[in-house]
Amino acid sequence: MPLKKSELYASIWASCDELRGGMDASQYKDYVLVLLFVKYVSDKYVGQKNPLIVIPPGGSFAEMVTLKGQKDIGDGMNKIIARLAEANELKGVIDVADFNDEDKLGKGKEMQDRLSNLVAIFENPGLDFSRNRAEGDDLLGDAYEYLMRHFATESGKSKGQFYTPAEVSRVMAKVIGIGAAKSADTTIYDPTCGSSSLLLKAADEAQVKISVYGQEMDNATAALARMNMILHDNPSAVIWKDNSLSSPHWKEKDGRLKAFDYVVANPPFSTKAWSNGFDPEHDLYGRFEDGIPPQKNGDYAFLLHILRSMKSTGKGAVILPHGVLFRGGTEGEIRRNIIRKGYIKGIIGLPPNLFYGTGIPACIIVLDKENAAGRTGIFMVNASQGFMKDGNKNRLRHQDLHKIVDVFTRQLESSKYARMVSLAEIEANDYNLNIPRYIDNSAEEDVQDIAAHLLGGIPECDIAGLHAYWQVFPSLRLKLFALARPGYVEMKVGAAQVKAVVFEHPEFKAYHARSMDLFEAWKKAHRPLLAGVGLSKKKLQQPPKK
């Protein structure tokens, strides 16, 4: 019997209640997620031959169960985790939380009860991951991200940097075209990977398993990323803990930065101390040839690092605040140089308040080196109005996500939403990329007709605004409206009768019949395909070609 996500989420989230009080959310996530990891790998790999994760004697969740009610439960849990970490080269990854910390977990009986209750929650038979569905199922990974999303919400603005909303991650994955990747040699990199949620979503978009690289400077967050990769059945992914700007880890043998096929990133906004630990004027990797960013704002430092980390055929997407689009000074010079090189393929303006670490509106800058030489314009999308409220944050809906991706990938121009802006127009605007300068999505003013209010009647211009309908049903207009006086019409039928008049009109009936014929033809042609839709992740059988 497969696990239900709702039951899994409820059971795991209940464990957080055992830890509240002694620490804030940014700390108790370390405990809950480590236990989730230990329970999962114990259920999944214990007793297996050649497992991805080795479960050593005295290093499984079963040993934790035997500690319930014992005075030394905290110390015992630490030792179990240490054995598991040592057997799998996971030191510094899964042993970041101290289960014997009296300041966070209480003293004596309080710690004993709290940890015993916590283990009991994970001991629930309903959380038997050995009975999980097929190999590679993301049920556990989804639960992991569910927890991280809630931790980010509770942690507040200063602690939510480790998570990129899944919808935004999917947009980035799709607009860089990683779905076209067919080889396991394809590489993807995130220099500020956080918990790796963005990196995972991007890698999952590929048709095959690709090579995944990440770097994260925060120790606890880097540990989250490594565990997240394992829980998503991606144990070969390599996450390095260090500062990507001052100490980039991924390099070629000759010392140059390693170049990747795809790069995605959601770096911290407007980092003030970005140059700590190295001298940008004498950068060993040539990242700042287009200019050195301001000392107290690192937005362009990350962008330049990303560009340097892309192959000559590389694609990328990075989330940055809107300020990078229009700020002047040295940032303006860097922006001009990057635009002239043709590296920017497009810009997607996102709704405000999407991210847990900040309420600042952000954009996705889409990068493309492969087609840079022939670039004649930058495709801009103003998606700032498409979202739903989700608690105290905003969130992209499925229709918002699909609209952004469809419009961007097909380069479809849409009034007040998207257009291709020529490089000549951008140059004429002094390389200012502020989206409202090129796409006006302000609401049209509601013009009131005073004469209609005073004398009655419906302005003919309002009726003419429905011209798309009158083209299909030309005589229906005459059936509904009569001239009242020059420029104004009046209804020939009462409001209650409008629907019946429309439905009984010959032109509407003929249109409806044609529509149904087309639908029936489509249904007949696609029935074999639709009949194959089920819960299986296997590729659907296509209908036989005629």
Locate the predicted segments by residue.
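Hydrophobic alpha-helical scaffolding
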Residues: 108, 133, 214-218, 262, ...
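Non-catalytic, mostly N-terminal accessory regions of nucleic-acid modification and defense proteins
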Residues: 1-180, 244-249, 349-352, 375-376, ...
